[in-house]
């Protein structure tokens, strides 16, 4: 086997591992966002009382006030390509299960701030 083939095989192995790790981070973050939506956003009376609707689709949580029409931007919380949580175009970093409560509270703080609750 030539040196070029050896290097190529090493690179291919590293890339496969990195891709697997990225998909795992993305899966963890998506599961967290789904749980956050189901347990904290969907049943929230505060959001309902203030006319804020929420939808979850394709690893995106979208919160908006329908009565504001198209004049007010919705708040997007998304799972990024590398498994990070992004809110309003700003990254909150990768999700780690050990930081679940802290990440939830950070998201809740951002929602409160965005909608002036």
PLM regions: where:
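Mixed-charge, Lys/Arg-enriched low-complexity segments
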Residues: 1-16, 24, 98-117
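N-terminal functional modules and adjacent low-complexity/disordered segments of proteins
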Residues: 3, 42, 56-58, 87, ...
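Generic intrinsically disordered, low-complexity segments enriched for polar/acidic and small residues
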Residues: 5, 17, 29, 33-34, ...
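Negatively charged, low-complexity tracts enriched in Asp/Glu with abundant Ser/Thr
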Residues: 8-64
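Intrinsically disordered, low-complexity regulatory segments enriched in Ser/Thr/Pro
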Residues: 62-106, 113, 117
């Amino acid at each position: 086997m030539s040196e070029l083939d050896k290097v190529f095989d090493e690179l291919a192995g590293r890339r496969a591992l990195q891709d697997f790790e990225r998909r795992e981070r993305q899966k963890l973050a998506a599961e967290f966002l789904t749980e956050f939506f189901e347990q904290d956003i969907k049943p929230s009376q505060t959001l309902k009382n203030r006319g804020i609707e929420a939808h979850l689709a394709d690893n995106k949580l979208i919160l908006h006030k329908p009565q504001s029409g198209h004049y007010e931007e919705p708040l997007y919380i998304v799972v990024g390509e590398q498994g990070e949580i992004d809110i309003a175009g700003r990254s909150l970093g990768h999700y780690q299960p050990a930081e679940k409560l802290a990440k939830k509270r950070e998201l809740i703080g951002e929602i409160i701030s965005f909608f002036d609750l």
